[in-house]
Amino acid sequence: MTAQTDVTENIRTRPIFIAIANQKGGVGKTTTVLNLGAALAAQGYRTLVVDLDLQANLTHCLVEPPRDDQPNMCEVILDEVSVAGVIVSTDTPNLFVAPAGESMANLEINLAAAIGREQALRTALQHAAVSEFDFVLMDNPPCLSLVTINSMVAADYIVVPVSCEYLPMLGLKWLLKSVEKVRARLHPNLKILGYLLTMYDRREGITTDVEEILREQFGDEMFTTVIRINTRHKSAPSERKTIFQYEHSRRGRGTEDFSALARELLKRLSLPARRSRRSAG
């Protein structure tokens, strides 16, 4: 059963919060947040991407990372500064980032002692500055942590990238256990919007094997769209560009894939493929 629902009215009054999560590293979480965010922005949806990974890869893909004396999402989550004070515009119209910084390395320790520690991110994002967005996409660290739990608690939906390899597929059971615990204890309405195959290479036999297993297991919860293997996804961040900026062509492989993903995601949410100027405000 898919997470399709009519949120057309909700998009006008509050953002849709989506956590991009998988407890296995190297499956394309940051690439997905970066380029899905850019694809939604290109369709007229004001999109905020939130970097919750201490490596700050998403931040480096878009903007100069904060200096040591500048606040980032660590201080936001710890309620030391407002999220409005860290949101930065990017070179892509409608796309904004809430960056991570070096202080994220201490976030887990400080958050562990906080009251309402699992709710800290959700509370921080309940801000007028965030309500101006249509979508908030959250990039997560490659492990189950308090930060990941915070992201799930703050999210309406989860999108799960799975690279076409054996080990990431095995790791899904741990993610699903985490989701069930969050639903049971903290957020019963949390939904999985879909599973996304990444690093897809039809020439590799393992790709076909993984796809068959996952589509049989998850059925309609699997996105029809796949993100094909593409060396440009590795090259674009070095120039602080999204795949759309880097390929600069509607026929580029990455551009095609993430445009298709955005359309499919919007369809699952019963939202128009393009945000009208009037409703975008």
Annotate the PLM regions.
Residues 1-281:
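P-loop NTP-binding core
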